[in-house]
Amino acid sequence: MIESKLHEAPGMPTRAGLINTITTATTLLTMLLSGCSSANKQAHTLYVAYSIADNEFTQSSKERIEKQISLRTQLFLRTNPNTRVVTVAYKDSQLQDQVTKDSQLNLGPDIILAGDYQLRNLYQDSLISAFPNSSVWAQQYSDVLKGLSTVDNKLAFAPYGILPQVSCYNNKTVKQPPKTIQELVMLGASGVRIGLSTNPYEIFWTAGSVGAIPEIGSLINSKYQKKLQPKINEWITWLRQAALYQNISFYRQNSELVNELANNNLDWISCHSLDIVRLREEMGEQLSIATLPNGVQTKAFAWPGVLGYGLGTDSSPTQRELALSYVKANTNAVGQRRVMLLTEDFLPANKAVDIPNQSSQTLKANNDSWNTQTLSYLKQWPMIFQYLETKSALAVGKTLTELTSGNISVDDAVQALTNLGKKGKE
């Protein structure tokens, strides 16, 4: 999911140009206001960069995300009213390279809001700084989130929110969400239009429901690659059979599922909590959220995203203090609970925030996805990550697309997914 590079798309101003424009505008505004204001203190500027998936880098997406960031910025401005916060959007695929280029010019951002995987890569390349007093910052997180964000006992980035993988559906058509994948198939047979993605990060939840995750994880060890994998075969067979049903359709990306549900071309999809705000804007009260269907004996392998804040390396001492204040305002329990209740599109990273399961079906679904589905696979997660790095997530997605399109057989798909060649460890 969720689940998520620092530079403008073609046609957007360069970072240097943006800074010059803002500096000029700030100077002029200060001069204009100096005669009618008793407080002539010039505002400090804090640059917050964030990334958007390449295929979702549109004006509407940027406006929607900017609106969400604005909620977080308001928390910060309560205690830092004389600060100007400037946000800049970049494509995911460009983040690493452009932060590198900007940092070489001492023009890097003060804060980067991105996914945990991106932030770890930035930290490894010394493009973001560890948090000072890391042990104090880390106290607000669970052991799982500390493990994701800590490198050599230093907090590489500050987790902000968990973005659980859930199901989104039209409650006018789906009266009762399916609790198992067997019920999901029955739902499709009744005429409900179901959408699934062949992206491995979006479809591996079904491998969990079938019980295939342990076998997939075992493939990183070469001695298991030539053994029979009955659960993997069962999972691939389930996907192939699902593709044969009239009302179950497969798409390459999660964004396509969201578009189709919003346009009333689908009734039930797998989604991420980050999609909730957009879908709610377009579907209104017809949108409902539930956990993904489990199997009879095993849980869905719900793949979450984790969003966090990284500290840029080019901040002045004043900007660094402001950046730390911004992150603190957005990761403390009060701020996190406030935004959670307003948006319902994430789970707070701060472990001190209680989730109101009784009053919000959406937050309950997010909470159950993370705590009862995702965390039930703690032992398997490292192996699944390694499998997709070794095999290549793109190659896995291509195989699953070929399978669900009818271009290859179940046996061919199983062979393709289980044959890691010499890349598996001995």
Explain the meaning of each model-derived region:
Residues 119-121, 270-287:
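A ligand-binding cleft/hinge motif common to bilobed small-molecule-binding domains
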Residues 156-160, 165, 182-233, 266:
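Extracytoplasmic/periplasmic solute-binding protein
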Residues 114-166, 176-179, 288-290:
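Hinge/lid segment of periplasmic solute-binding proteins
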Residues 65, 365-425:
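C-terminal capping/gating helix-and-loop segments adjacent to ligand/active sites or protein-protein/ligand interfaces
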Residues 221-253:
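Glycine-centered hinge/linker elements that transmit conformational signals in sensory
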Residues 281-347:
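Extracytoplasmic/periplasmic substrate-recognition and gating elements
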Residues 89-98, 249-259:
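Short helix-initiation/N-cap motifs at beta->coil->alpha
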Residues 2-4, 23-118, 420-426:
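Conserved N-terminal structural module of periplasmic/extracytoplasmic solute-binding proteins
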